[in-house]
């Protein structure tokens, strides 16, 4: 991706380099069983399809050997709750709910983008059909809300559901804006970041706010953690776009240059097209050509984005957003876990 993102040492403190990965594994261990029970409670064939999408088993229910996701959003809930003095048990249902919402968006995303592969194997829509994939996404969304209705404190449950549903509305708007950006002759970096604020940052901000909420934090702390998660989500999307162009297909589970082949208006591309360089002119011609991108076109587009500085802009943006995220944290909740999850974004490969 043209270099690894680095953060100012003042923001990092003495956080162990492997803490972030340990937090993801802990989130998987704590949240996974609740997620399994939620999926198994669904009627067939929804349960089988949901477990397939989550990477737990194959279409015939035989054990799958692939990835089952990172549990990054669940880890954000746990870390935010812990930073506010909350209990893991209280945060677990919320963690499961946000993972379900995240996966509902992935199911719909795959349909809208026409992606036939996720995590190295066929997507749900390409196995069972478009209509089924949409309905499964709806079912995961409904199951997430059902989990939150079971929270012990009814007041917290209502506030949590309200926040989650507002973030879902923001997600829909962000996804709609993403659709509008495709094929637009002129898209600015600000246009892109406004879209990413809804498509990605809304949910990561919600995750952190919900963690603080179940820990009974005050409104100011909840707002600060939501801002932290929002900025982190923008950084996550920036890095996601870098991976979409320069990521290793063996790690990402998607074809090389997948975003470029589909002429997606990702941040590196948008930045490159706005560079007013010769490379930008040639890249614009490739993006506006009526014929589908060939493998050589994708290779050339990749080189042009790099020459025009698109990768550098996206890296810098991710770095700035992570620093803004950490700066948003009050000292009382600036925990090693939250810092470690911030660092993890810099080092992610898929």
Swiss-Prot record:
Catalysed reactions, as listed in the record: isopentenyl diphosphate + (2E,6E)-farnesyl diphosphate = (2E,6E,10E)-geranylgeranyl diphosphate + diphosphate
Listed CDD domains: Trans_IPPS_HT
InterPro entries: Isoprenoid_synthase_dom_sf, Polyprenyl_synt, Polyprenyl_synt_CS
Binding site for Mg(2+) 1: 109, 113
One function term, GO molecular function aspect: prenyltransferase activity
Pathway: Isoprenoid biosynthesis; geranylgeranyl diphosphate biosynthesis; geranylgeranyl diphosphate from farnesyl diphosphate and isopentenyl diphosphate: step 1/1
Binding, isopentenyl diphosphate: 70, 73, 102, 119
Pfam families given in the database record: polyprenyl_synt
Keyword Transferase assigned: yes
EC number from the UniProt entry: 2.5.1.29
Binding sites annotated in the UniProt record for Mg(2+) 2: 109, 113
Highest taxon listed in the record's lineage: Bacteria
Textual note on the cofactor: Binds 2 Mg(2+) ions per subunit.
UniProt keyword Metal-binding present: yes
Motif window: DDXXD motif: 109-113, 240-244
Cofactor list: Mg(2+)
GO annotation terms (biological process): geranylgeranyl diphosphate biosynthetic process; isoprenoid biosynthetic process
Keyword field: Lipid biosynthesis, Lipid metabolism, Magnesium, Metal-binding, Transferase
Enzyme class: transferase
One GO location term (cellular component): cytosol
Function: Catalyzes the condensation of isopentenyl pyrophosphate (IPP) with (2E,6E)-farnesyl diphosphate (E,E-FPP) to yield geranylgeranyl diphosphate (GGPP).
Domain notes per entry: Contains two aspartate-rich DDxxD motifs, designated as FARM (the first aspartate-rich motif) and SARM (the second aspartate-rich motif).
Family that this chain belongs to: Belongs to the FPP/GGPP synthase family.
Protein name: Geranylgeranyl diphosphate synthase
Species lineage: Bacteria, Bacillati, Actinomycetota, Actinomycetes, Mycobacteriales
């Amino acid at each position: 991706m043209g270099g690894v993102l680095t953060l100012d040492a003042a923001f990092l403190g003495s956080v162990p380099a492997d803490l972030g990965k340990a937090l993801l594994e802990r989130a998987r261990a704590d949240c996974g069983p609740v997620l399994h029970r939620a999926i198994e409670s669904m009627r067939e064939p929804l349960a089988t399809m949901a477990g397939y999408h989550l990477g737990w088993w194959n279409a015939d229910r035989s054990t799958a050997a692939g990835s089952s996701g990172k549990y990054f959003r669940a880890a954000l809930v746990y870390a935010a709750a812990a930073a506010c003095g909350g209990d893991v048990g209280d945060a677990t249902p919320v963690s499961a709910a946000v993972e379900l919402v995240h996966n509902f968006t992935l199911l719909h995303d795959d349909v809208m983008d026409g992606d036939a592969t996720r995590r190295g194997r066929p997507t749900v829509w390409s196995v069972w059909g478009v209509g089924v994939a949409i309905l499964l996404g709806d079912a995961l969304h409904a199951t997430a809300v059902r989990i939150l209705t079971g929270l012990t404190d009814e007041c917290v449950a209502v506030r949590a559901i309200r926040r989650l549903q507002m973030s879902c509305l923001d997600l829909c708007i962000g996804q709609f804006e993403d659709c509008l950006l495709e094929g637009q002759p002129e898209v600015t970096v600000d246009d892109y970041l406004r879209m990413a604020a809804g498509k990605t940052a809304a949910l990561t901000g919600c995750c952190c706010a919900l963690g603080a909420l179940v820990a009974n934090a005050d409104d100011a702390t909840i707002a600060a953690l939501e801002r932290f998660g929002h900025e982190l989500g923008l950084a996550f999307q920036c890095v996601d776009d870098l991976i979409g162009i320069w990521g290793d297909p063996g790690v990402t589970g998607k074809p090389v240059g997948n975003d470029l082949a589909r002429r997606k208006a990702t941040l590196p591309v948008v930045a490159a097209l706005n560079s007013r360089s010769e490379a930008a002119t040639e890249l614009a011609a490739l993006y506006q050509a009526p014929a589908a991108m060939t493998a050589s076109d994708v290779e050339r587009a990749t080189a042009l984005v790099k020459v025009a500085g698109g990768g550098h802009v996206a890296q810098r943006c991710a770095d700035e957003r992570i620093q803004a995220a950490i700066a948003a944290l009050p000292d009382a909740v600036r925990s090693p876990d939250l810092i470690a999850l911030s660092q993890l974004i810099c080092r992610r490969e898929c």
